[in-house]
Amino acid sequence: MADNSYTDIMEKNHMEIPWHDYARQDGNILIDKAGLIEKASVIGRVGLIMLSCGTGAWRVRTSMNRLSKELGVTCTVDVGLMSIEFNCFDGNDCISQSLSIANTGVNTSKLYRMEQFVDNFPNEEAHLTGEEIHRRLDEIEQIHAIYSPARLGLAAAIACCAFTFLLGGGPIEMILAFVAAGIGNLICTKLIKHHFTLFLNIAVSISASCFIYAAFLKIAEMAFNVPSIHEAGYICSMLFIIPGFPFITSGIDLAKLDLRSGLERLAYAIIIVMVATMFAWIMALLLRLQPMDFEDLNLTPVLHLILRLIMSFFGVFGFSIMFNSPAPMAATAALIGAIANSLRLELVDLTGMPAPAAAFAGALTAGLLASFIKENNGYPRISLTVPSIVIMVPGLYLYRAIYNFGIMALSDAVSWFASAIMIIIALPLGLIFARILTDKTFRYCT
């Protein structure tokens, strides 16, 4: 009997759509002269690919609307996290379709290509047949991870190492977090590649990161007499799992009253956080780890600012690579994040500004910078803003809240949780108001 993996023999729960069956095969009729069914197949597929990239309902609907206008079709769209329901009207006929994706994720490289496709549609694709357009969409749809699992593991290692410093950790915590996060995300990427379910991916990768951090700390204790107080950094080794994209896009969707998409994305992000923090808490109990405070680094204000700028750059760069951004796009997001996150931290330290207010200021700055840069290089705004502020998402606060809930220290748990919620609310608000100030199409209710 052949040795087949489960993914080779199991029946797919989401059947693939034969898109080319909806296009005329004679190759003589351009898409703008085609029938409503053929036009709807192109419009729906564009929306579905946009949705699979992780972008919000506003961007998905905008892209579908632009194609509809070019094709002489009226389109109404309802967008969720995993599915799209839309209706197309041409004055004579009406077609309703419900489309869904098998899994959700983030792919900023594919999103960039799709935005170029939509922008160029009036000049290029509108003069092609439906079959030719679907072939081009086939090519874009094949853009999967442009980095190997090893490189994505390295990106997570760099991001979490930088994150550790920004949260107050020292060199030892940074080194241990580098190793543990790198291996943890490598495992997570491998599991995703083999299509394992979400809960299993989170549980295994988080457990592995905690175990590796504790194991290497124990080795360092025995070999170099490193004190056990450095166990505080184990939290930082699992911050690669933070669902920054769905958290932020949910806020943007809610701001535009796309309640279905916003609430579904928020629920998805909460699921990831709850599963991750629960397994991290269980591992902490098994390994006897405690989320203690970091030791004071005793840095001068100027040196601290310089290091914050550097670490913010590398932290955002790492997260952006994990979102499948090309290196130039990741570097651009990293420059924005270095400025915005350092501003946030300095406002807290130098002015005593509450952390949520500083988070709003940092996110607003990131949004304004991204809008300015978008005008010059054409990168999708969300591909710059979300990576640049994901480093501000209070993963440490969320974990400490769940940890204290677990040990029934309810007063501390509520305090950490309230602080986290305030910051999580402030971050998308900053991006939303930056968008309102710089994008007139977003400013009005249409």
Region annotations inferred by a language model:
Residues F240-F245, Y268-L350:
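Generic multipass alpha-helical transmembrane bundles of integral membrane proteins
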Residues A220-I229, L287-P301, N404-S415:
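Membrane-interface helix termini and inter-helical loops of multi-pass transporters
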Residues F121-R136, A150-C161, F178-C188, A284-P291, ...:
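Hydrophobic, membrane-facing alpha-helical anchors
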Residues M1-R135, E139-E141:
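Soluble N-terminal domains of membrane-associated systems
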Residues G233-M238, T249-D253, L257-V273, L335-T446:
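C-terminal transmembrane helix-loop-helix hairpin of multi-pass membrane proteins
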Residues I146-T249, I321-F323, A327, T332:
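Core alpha-helical transmembrane segments of integral membrane proteins
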